[in-house]
A protein has these predicted regions:
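FIC/Doc superfamily catalytic core
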Residues: 1-247
Length: 247
């Protein structure tokens, strides 16, 4: 009996995309904990460094330092498309950057921010702009994995050169909220009346930058709008261990 293993290029791409979509689900709890602990110490080291350059290379370098020896692709731009099922979107995915356009899109966002002037802006306007910038940068998802942690570290270091006393404390306490806020800033479904919004990210930033005490509950971000105060508060269920270190 002869079996044919010939598949089309499109079928091969679909298999590869499916692999990268599901790979994280196959990690054991011990593997996840080991990864988180290693990355946590590297985040602490990175945020203790005084050197920083606002550039694409700096962002890529942070990813490499955080995930060297953990991910084979550490510091490498992905060359495949990805999807990620999001709880906050009822299983839908954000449309991440196309693999063929990642470098160009990435560099464009950096050039736009580098040439932007914060002069004469109110604090509300500054926070809104920062929310738009960081959500756009995250949406590109230039790496296969580790984008949110890399974005958070880069963002903290960038905020510091802008004069803010940013620490990782709020990220440690609200890591899942931060990610869900980034997701909501990049998802639109007109048929369901859902529009991308930075409002949740701005609330997060107001706590971070202005020391406000706004409540950050993941249930408030869910697109169904059905999760209310009477249901279990899952706000801190998935706290990212990688941010459980203070600076």
């Amino acid at each position: 009996m002869v079996f044919s293993f010939l598949i089309t290029i499109q079928e091969a791409k679909s298999l590869i995309d499916s692999y990268y979509e599901e790979r994280l689900d196959h990690m054991s709890d011990d593997e996840r904990i080991e990864e988180a602990d290693k990355v946590s110490s590297r985040i602490a080291e990175s945020l203790s460094e005084r050197a920083f350059s606002f550039s694409p290379n700096e962002y890529i370098s942070i990813h490499r330092k955080l995930f060297q020896g953990i991910y084979k692709h550490a510091g490498n731009i992905r060359d495949y498309n990805i999807t990620k099922k999001e709880w906050v979107l009822d299983g839908a995915t954000v449309m991440y950057g196309s693999a063929s356009e990642l470098r160009a899109t990435f560099e464009y966002d950096f050039s736009q921010e580098k040439n932007f002037s914060y002069k004469y802006l109110s604090m509300d306007e500054i926070i809104h702009h920062l929310a738009v910038f960081i959500s756009n940068l995250w949406q590109i998802h230039i790496f296969g994995e580790g984008n949110t942690r890399t974005t958070a570290v880069f963002f903290i270091k960038y905020l510091r050169i802008l004069g803010f006393s940013a620490t990782n404390d709020i990220f440690a306490e609200n890591a899942w909220y931060f990610r869900n806020a980034l997701v909501r800033a990049n998802y639109t479904n007109l048929q369901k009346g859902i529009h991308e919004t930075t409002e949740y990210l701005e609330v997060f930033l107001r706590n971070l930058l202005l020391n406000e005490k706004n409540e950050l509950h993941n249930r408030n971000l869910h697109i169904s709008g059905l999760l209310n105060e009477e249901k279990v508060d899952i706000g801190n269920v998935k706290v990212d261990r990688c941010f459980q270190t203070s600076f």
